[in-house]
Amino acid sequence: MMAEVARVLASSKNVIAFTGAGISAESGIPTFRGKDGLWKKYRPEELATPEAFERNPKLVWDFYKWRIKKILKAKPNPAHYALVELEKMGILKAVITQNVDDLHREAGTKNLIELHGNIFRVRCTSCEFREHLKESGRIDEILSEDLPKCPKCGSLLRPDVVWFGEPLPSKELNEAFKLAKEADVVIVVGTSGLVYPAAYIPYIVKDSGGVVIEINVQKSGITPIADFFLRGKAGEILPKLVQEVRRIL
């Protein structure tokens, strides 16, 4: 099946990738839904909400500081780099991710759409201020503050991520849906396919006559519409797939 999938990719003009927590789990980042997603006995869905932040911003910030420290230790894995290779080969047009860990960008992906935000970005709860902490070099400063404040207006800063119950950013979502309509192939990597509206992306590709390739350690909500299902770790499968594509080209 690997050779057949490689042939599909090699002959495609417009491929997109749609990635979820599974691709980052291989870099050692706990998934929200897994048993290792717990922090101090709290479930993420108890903390990653606007209500929790309003009730106890310090608790929510402590949770995010813990996640930031964990993610800072993580490195992109072979799956991230394989997607970069496909982009360099001119096959992959964009990566649409549900992850907030910045690993795709760190690996070198150029055209990246982050549907759920980025844990290294902060935004003000009052004014328009936004900041990417890796770019500004202020990660340590934010981690050392009890409650990070906006340098412009002094209001509370919050992580620039999408919390449970919040809408996805319309610009990114519209762009992702547009790419999905135009794509002839989507590579779905490590997503449960349960978080909507993001999970519509493979369905849009399918409805537009495209091919759905899924790479996952287990079956997901996307599997029923997948034309190809490659079971296993993305870090093992994607590099092999890239090798096969190279051989064909």
From Swiss-Prot:
One of its GO terms (cellular component) is cytoplasm. Keywords: Cytoplasm, Metal-binding, NAD, Transcription, Transcription regulation, Transferase, Zinc. The keyword Transcription regulation applies. Substrate binds at Y64, R67. It is found in: Cytoplasm. Its main location: cytoplasm. It comes from the Archaea. InterPro entries: DHS-like_NAD/FAD-binding_dom, NAD-dep_sirtuin_deacylases, Sirtuin, Sirtuin_cat_small_dom_sf, Sirtuin_class_III, Ssirtuin_cat_dom. Residues 1-249 form the Deacetylase sirtuin-type domain. NAD(+) binds at residues 20-39, 98-101, 190-192, 216-218, 234. This is NAD-dependent protein deacylase. It comes from Pyrococcus horikoshii (strain ATCC 700860 / DSM 12428 / JCM 9974 / NBRC 100139 / OT-3). The gene is cobB.
